[in-house]
Amino acid sequence: MKMKKLTLAIAAIALCAAAAAQTTPEEFQTRYDRLVRNLGYDGVGVETLLDRWEEAFPDDAAVPKARFNYYFTKSQRSEVLPKPGQRRFLGNAPTLTLKDSDGGDVNYFEEYFYDEELFGEAMKVLDAQIAAHPDELRWHYLKITALSAFEKESPDMAAAELRQLIAHDASAHPAWTLDGESAGTEIFQQGVGEYCASFFGIGTDAGYEYFREISELMTKRFPRNPVFIDNIGSYWLVAKDNEKQAVKFYKKALKIDPQDEAATRNLKIIERRQAQAKAKKK
């Protein structure tokens, strides 16, 4: 095992030395991809390669993305910890289940922790890119994703960042891009929708409230998009166990799109639950 690590480290040094002779961004990218495959985003030699890449091609957007990945990955450590009474943690199934002294099941989950200084360096990279390229969605998405991972059960900063993004869209009507390509309003809505789903998947009170709040903002911004109306219905159904309110929003979504699968499926679930409840009373 030690010999394998030594071999990989020597290979990393060789790759970085070769990088000094690279003449195109594509060649740097190839060297970087090979290094990451072997050693990971924060492996030996990655930072040196990025320094040389940035020096040779300071405007290559691949460099800050790679540098963010370097700091973000380096800031992480994980532990498998017991979470008594929890079936899921941050939307994830248990890594393993063991018995306690009374014979009961105790679920263990992998949980990530972050070095604040290194995480801060990752955020500096993204903030600089957002300031320089405010209409490039990738930088915003990376920041929201990282903040949500850092905050875990209560994604306060991630939600605030998402609110700012929606406000910017409403006030400035920017010509969004995603990875340098033109991104229309549908792509923007899809991206926000994915973060709503992420907040919902956290499964905490804070996650549900941000799921509702962002969905309501997007419903005001895009009233003809049934996805966010469905979201509000799901908030009432799952977080508040209020079927009457949920039905109201699902039916509203179906008026906009009669083929809305989410609304149709959830209304059937509610109907089945109500029928079962009536049957029990008989």
Give the positions of each predicted feature:
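Residue-level recognition of tetratricopeptide repeat
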Residues: 69, 145-147, 197, 234-235, ...
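TPR alpha-solenoid repeat register
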Residues: 63, 139, 174-175, 191, ...
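Short coil/linker segments at helix-helix boundaries
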Residues: 70-128, 132, 149-189, 193-195, ...
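Alpha-helical adaptor scaffolds
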Residues: 178-238
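Short coil turns that delineate tetratricopeptide repeat
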Residues: 58-61, 131-135, 170-171, 222-224, ...
